[in-house]
Amino acid sequence: MRERIEALIRDYQKNKMELKCLEHQIRNFRGISENEMIDTMYFTQPEGERVQTSGVSDKTAKIAMSYRERMDAMNEEWYQHLEKQYFALAEEISFFESAVKALPGKMGEIMQDMIFSQASWDELADKHFVGRTTIWRYRQKAIDERVVLYEKHEAEMTAYMLS
């Protein structure tokens, strides 16, 4: 669990950027076009036994009859995949942010500046009038406290899912 929290701290800005990218993809979703779908269907090789009955016209007829349904299904699947990723990442970021903001006193202020503002350790030391060792101790203590919180959160989610 400790490694997970350290990864969340380290990757916070990357995760926020990924969330914005997913939001942009969802807002501007266009899906696969009709021409792309027809090309995909036309140039794929059939699976299973190969018995050719009437050549190209049979394949063309099948494509003409089913391309729209397959295109809509693929687009819907992809859109749902993007939404699922977005909501999972948004929930993870939201819980992480609230967990960091819940840290008490100077430790909370330092961790918020470290994570959300991406302040360097020297900037943190100057701003909060503490040494680098104190910042390191605050960071370790904050991670330890968040481990307990995340373990409790995970246990609650597991209990809910099993009930």
Residue ranges and their predicted role:
Residues 118-134:
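Helix-turn-helix DNA-binding module
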Residues 1-99, 148-163:
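N-terminal interaction/assembly modules
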Residues 5-8, 104, 128:
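A broadly tuned, weak detector of single residues within folded domains
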Residues 129-149:
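DNA-recognition helix of helix-turn-helix
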Residues 102-119:
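Short amphipathic alpha helix immediately N-terminal
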